[in-house]
Amino acid sequence: MVYTEGDINLVNTCLTCNYIYLDTKERKKFAQSSHEYLIQQLQINNYPIQGNTSIPLTFNHPVKELMWLLQSDSVLQVNELLNFSGQKKYIANSLPSNLKYNQFLRPHLLDKAKLTLNGQDRTDWHDYNYFYYVQNYESFRNCAEHFAYIYSFSLNPWNLLQPSGSLNFSRIDNASLSIKVNKDKVNTLNPAIIYIYAVNYNVLRIQSGMGGLKFAN
């Protein structure tokens, strides 16, 4: 299989929805009552990187888990928008005759990482295996090849109905994620972008036909 460069054009999109219809009495009761729902939100920090660095985490609210992905410019240049490894997915049109045995292995862009809160290390330096394999298995029983690194503050982050732990970033003055990268894949000649996601809890209030969040940023 070969790759070809070119823009990705969305020809058509659709949205699938589920509707719940209420009868007149139920609709009146629902409209006149106040409601509070525990919801989850997603916060995102994106930063360009060219080597080892410390990235400030500007999040708010009780966060149940952090997830981050690194993406090199080399894969973006061939429009592999969902490739977060250090190797293009597809083979080039022309190949040299002296290929190495590991030519098409997909290495990780992350080497090591640690999390720091208010000047105190929440974690020691761990290599990517800890955040990729151990945290994925402990939190989600997941070993898919997605190149997403995770750190969970919750015992069961997959449980959407019952929180089991979080870190209130609104009470943290300084939080940072320090990373060491695979220098063969991320450097000044081949920079990358790190995408950091935080899943947090909030409360959605609905009253008198109006909705809003209980806790603002």
Task: Give the location of each predicted region.
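Flexible assembly/topogenesis modules
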Residues: 1-217
